[in-house]
Amino acid sequence: MDPVTTQPAKKNILSYLLPRSGGEANKRLKVGFIYENTPQTSEWCYAHELGRQYIDETFGSQIETVSITNVRPKEDDYNAIQRLIDDNTDLIFVTSPSMMYASLKQAIAHPKAKILNCSLNISHKYIRTYYARMYEAKYLTGVIAGVMAKSDKIGYVASCPLYGVMANVNALLWGQGR
């Protein structure tokens, strides 16, 4: 007779971000998204909105999602985050790197709040950041640009002044091979 081996239950990403115990274990999670623009006018916001909709479709009644659009950095970002905190939002995605300082201020002021900002290289115990490894795609784009370019000159339009932009430019140039 072969013994039956039982695999331990796999934890999903939410269990790492939002450990729960006791009466909280059955509580419906509330996840908020803060957008600088609207999903209709910004591809960046639209991509995050697709993620929000995927959460709704996948988790159904287990997770409630909300979003706030047209939040201006350095003007009403702090208050938008505060509104979600006041509404007992468990996890807040601030989708603009331009709102990092408001995110960090709120994370420090409300250490129990789980705030993630879409940006790079902020190391602080109260906030987490996330961002795609865009340099990999930029490297491949550089390879294509290098093959197609008729001269040694190519252009790059940077989206915003953040740490990762220079890594993207460097990857593009490495890929181009010049």
Predicted regions and their residues:
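Flexible loop/hinge segments that line or gate small-molecule binding clefts
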Residues: 108-132
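Phosphate/pyrophosphate-binding betaalpha-module
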Residues: 151-178
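Signal peptide-proximal N-terminal region
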Residues: 53-66, 177-178
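Extracytoplasmic "Venus flytrap"
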Residues: 18, 31-51, 55, 68-75, ...
